[in-house]
Amino acid sequence: MTIANRILPHAPADHPPVPVPRVGVLLANLGTPDATDYWSMRRYLNEFLSDRRVIDYPIWKWQPLLQLIILSKRPFTSGNNYRSIWNEERDESPLMTITRDQVRKLRAAVETRYGAGNVVVDFCMRYGNPSTRDVLDDMLAQGCERILFLPLYPQYAGATSATANDQFFRALMQVKRQPAARTVPEYFARPSYIEALASSVERVYATLDTRPDVLVASYHGMPKRYHREGDPYHCQCQKTSRLLRERLGWGPDSIDTTFQSVFGTEEWLRPYTVEHVVQLAEAGKKNIAVISPAFSADCIETLEEINGEIREAFEHAGGESFTYVPCLNDDDLHIAALLEVVEENLAGWID
């Protein structure tokens, strides 16, 4: 990291270096374990499942169950799942690899838009590394006096966008000199985001010999109770699917909206993806495609769960062709959509 410093003509000779003032753009995603061994997985899962935004059961009830039972077994199974998709060359999860690529491309686009050295673009993870606090400290050291915080979740949910913001605010509470700060709201309805989604579907469909009978839009699930308590996530997922269908020019029954990654015994948003694809196969729809509009980058939930477990369930039920449409990742249209979000939210700070 190279830091350019200002020369202060009226400062005493022993005055510490003062960085050139900059604007920061800090992207945030969910997180990833550092490795696939038991203790790395346990640390990661403990941080994730101890988040009150994710699991809001009473602490006295949840923590004994988590520490004594869940974290004694789940790190083994989760570690095996991560090993099946691990980027061995870089020794990191695909989410980490893809997020680095996204930031590299967005950084170049921001530099083209605002000039070299004026805006610092970096990323953090809500759970695991790089932590929000560590990256915030690094950005402050580079002279960022204003920071735009961008959770990479197109749809808002308390368990994703809000907890990322919480962690950013907690990090701000721990620094002596706070920068000006803004957070970016959900962006699921932006035409540029919908265009990127639609284009990804069209590219994949163009490679297929036979058009799938249906496109399943699988979103990460959450307890139905959270929806009843006011979380807008379910509504935003439904609208995302509708906007995607309208942009593609498809009929009303061409996209099914489902929810995955159910955890625990509580009722979650339905229909469940794994059950729905089985029902499709049993109903004679043997050729399907699946897309994950809520994930900005491919990760354990898409590469292992959708393209592994859910694919297997579909094929076991008699399905013949299962096409997975990758996440937007570092696709140029996705980066352009993110740049548009950044430009809009930096207005008044830098032009």
Curated annotation (Swiss-Prot):
It comes from the Bacteria. The keyword Acyltransferase does not apply. Fe cation binds at H220, E301. One of its GO terms (biological process) is heme biosynthetic process. Its EC number is 4.98.1.1. One of its GO terms (molecular function) is ferrochelatase activity. Keywords: Cytoplasm, Heme biosynthesis, Iron, Lyase, Metal-binding, Porphyrin biosynthesis. Pathway: Porphyrin-containing compound metabolism; protoheme biosynthesis; protoheme from protoporphyrin-IX: step 1/1. GO terms for cellular component: cytoplasm. Its main location: cytoplasm. InterPro entries: Ferrochelatase, Ferrochelatase_AS, Ferrochelatase_C, Ferrochelatase_N. Pfam families: Ferrochelatase. It is found in: Cytoplasm. It catalyses: heme b + 2 H(+) = protoporphyrin IX + Fe(2+). Belongs to the ferrochelatase family. Catalyzes the ferrous insertion into protoporphyrin IX. HAMAP family: Ferrochelatase (MF_00323). NCBIfam families: hemH (TIGR00109). This is Ferrochelatase.
